[in-house]
Amino acid sequence: MQSVVNQDWRGALIRHLLLVLAASLVLGVVSGHYGWALALGLALYLGWTLWQLLRLHQWLRNHQPDEPPPDSYGLWGEVFDNIYHLQRRNQRARGRLQAVIDRIQESTAALRDAVIMLDSDGNLEWWNLAAENLLGLKTPQDGGQPVSNLIRHPRFKEYFDQEDYREPLEIPSPINERLRLQFHITLYGNREHLMLVRDVTRVHQLEQMRKDFVANVSHELRTPLTVIAGYLETLLDNVEDVNPRWLRALQQMQQQAGRMQNLLNDLLLLAKLEATDYPGDNKPVAVDALLASIRNDAQALSAGRNHRISLDAAPAVQLKGSEAELRSAFSNLVFNAVKYTPDEGEIRIRWWADEQGAHLSVQDTGIGVDPKHLPRLTERFYRVDSSRASNTGGTGLGLAIVKHVLIRHRARLEISSVPGKGSTFTCHFAPAQVAEAERKAPK
């Protein structure tokens, strides 16, 4: 098609030049000045061409989107006609695209969830009606405003700036504290943001009811269990007074009472962790000393199973947070490694820091976990193998506690495992949680 158009243009140009030459030749015959006649003819043709170029230039500079190009004839008539047809095609394509955009905007406007489009700098570009109802956005005066100026919650600003959107954020609505909103942010295009906001107030209320129920039941069961465990301990401390037929039954009762107490303690700890978003005592923690203490406890737990437990901890790297919560999380990881690693196996504990933050890894040569179970390991009471849990005395809440402690300390848990070869649990802490140890002045 392009070659045919080029041939038409060349043919039209040759015809126009031949016409100018013929007219100049006739004028030269009449006047007797062939050179001047030819020069005059070419000058007139050049002037006409320049005039058409000027018309095209003015149209391109000043025309409205739907204004057609100027009329002409001959070669320039074909140029303007082609521009007109191209303009019409673009108008039709633009109309189709606008119809698609309108349809998308109409469908998103009908959503009950808020949909907000932000540019690469976090400024508002477009939002639907639900965003106005949930966040109080106003059309059109909020257009172009930074989203952090309109949603002023400190956790939102921190969440938005860190650009780690793998987990959603839950905060109260900026216009109604009773509403609980969940934010999902996705990066697309040239670092632009698509933000989805959902009202999860009802889910939050049900979750709070569940937490309160578990906490209350745990508290109510704690006292009778303590009484039962105390009587069982008293009876077993006086074995000579116990009928031999009841001795094994009492020992089993004491074992199960101990498991119930551990379960209640874990449930109460989870309820405490879920009650607030951040630990109250956010102080620098000497992780190397903490891990050394946990390693000693792990060696005592190993109790003759000949585990090789090594520790490599950077003493200069500390964490800001709750020492009690960190001890609970780290000891859960290390004690699990001891429980699920065969006799004479190896457990490596490593603590270090780099430009991405601080990291704790617990690597073992245990039985490992099938990859299909890894995404659910941190769920409450999730069992890879129920018989395995009963043999080790676990409550099924250890990794759930680890997950909640890490969330409260701006960290995440990474799990890798190969069945039959072992597992590695790695805690990744954000740079903001890292605190350098104070260096003592030389004496």
Curated annotation (Swiss-Prot):
<dbReference type="InterPro" id="IPR003661">
    <property type="entry name" value="HisK_dim/P_dom"/>
</dbReference>
<keyword id="KW-1003">Cell membrane</keyword>
<keyword id="KW-0597">Phosphoprotein</keyword>
<keyword id="KW-0592">Phosphate transport</keyword>
<dbReference type="InterPro" id="IPR005467">
    <property type="entry name" value="His_kinase_dom"/>
</dbReference>
<dbReference type="Pfam" id="PF00512">
    <property type="entry name" value="HisKA"/>
</dbReference>
<dbReference type="InterPro" id="IPR050351">
    <property type="entry name" value="2-comp_sensor_kinase"/>
</dbReference>
<keyword id="KW-0808">Transferase</keyword>
<dbReference type="GO" id="GO:0005886">
    <property type="term" value="C:plasma membrane"/>
</dbReference>
<dbReference type="GO" id="GO:0004721">
    <property type="term" value="F:phosphoprotein phosphatase activity"/>
</dbReference>
<feature type="transmembrane region" description="Helical">
    <location>
        <begin position="17"/>
        <end position="37"/>
    </location>
</feature>
<keyword id="KW-0067">ATP-binding</keyword>
<dbReference type="InterPro" id="IPR035965">
    <property type="entry name" value="PAS-like_dom_sf"/>
</dbReference>
<dbReference type="InterPro" id="IPR036890">
    <property type="entry name" value="HATPase_C_sf"/>
</dbReference>
<dbReference type="InterPro" id="IPR013767">
    <property type="entry name" value="PAS_fold"/>
</dbReference>
<comment type="function">
    <text>Member of the two-component regulatory system PhoR/PhoB involved in the phosphate regulon genes expression. PhoR may function as a membrane-associated protein kinase that phosphorylates PhoB in response to environmental signals.</text>
</comment>
<feature type="modified residue" description="Phosphohistidine; by autocatalysis">
    <location>
        <position position="219"/>
    </location>
</feature>
<dbReference type="Pfam" id="PF02518">
    <property type="entry name" value="HATPase_c"/>
</dbReference>
<dbReference type="Pfam" id="PF00989">
    <property type="entry name" value="PAS"/>
</dbReference>
<dbReference type="Pfam" id="PF11808">
    <property type="entry name" value="PhoR"/>
</dbReference>
<feature type="domain" description="PAS">
    <location>
        <begin position="93"/>
        <end position="182"/>
    </location>
</feature>
<dbReference type="InterPro" id="IPR004358">
    <property type="entry name" value="Sig_transdc_His_kin-like_C"/>
</dbReference>
<dbReference type="GO" id="GO:0005524">
    <property type="term" value="F:ATP binding"/>
</dbReference>
<dbReference type="GO" id="GO:0000155">
    <property type="term" value="F:phosphorelay sensor kinase activity"/>
</dbReference>
<dbReference type="GO" id="GO:0006355">
    <property type="term" value="P:regulation of DNA-templated transcription"/>
</dbReference>
<dbReference type="InterPro" id="IPR014310">
    <property type="entry name" value="Sig_transdc_His_kinase_PhoR"/>
</dbReference>
<dbReference type="GO" id="GO:0016036">
    <property type="term" value="P:cellular response to phosphate starvation"/>
</dbReference>
<keyword id="KW-0472">Membrane</keyword>
<dbReference type="InterPro" id="IPR000014">
    <property type="entry name" value="PAS"/>
</dbReference>
<feature type="domain" description="Histidine kinase">
    <location>
        <begin position="216"/>
        <end position="433"/>
    </location>
</feature>
<dbReference type="GO" id="GO:0006817">
    <property type="term" value="P:phosphate ion transport"/>
</dbReference>
<keyword id="KW-0813">Transport</keyword>
<keyword id="KW-1133">Transmembrane helix</keyword>
<keyword id="KW-0902">Two-component regulatory system</keyword>
<keyword id="KW-0812">Transmembrane</keyword>
<protein>
    <recommendedName>
        <fullName>Phosphate regulon sensor protein PhoR</fullName>
        <ecNumber>2.7.13.3</ecNumber>
    </recommendedName>
</protein>
<dbReference type="InterPro" id="IPR036097">
    <property type="entry name" value="HisK_dim/P_sf"/>
</dbReference>
<keyword id="KW-0418">Kinase</keyword>
<keyword id="KW-0547">Nucleotide-binding</keyword>
<dbReference type="InterPro" id="IPR021766">
    <property type="entry name" value="PhoR"/>
</dbReference>
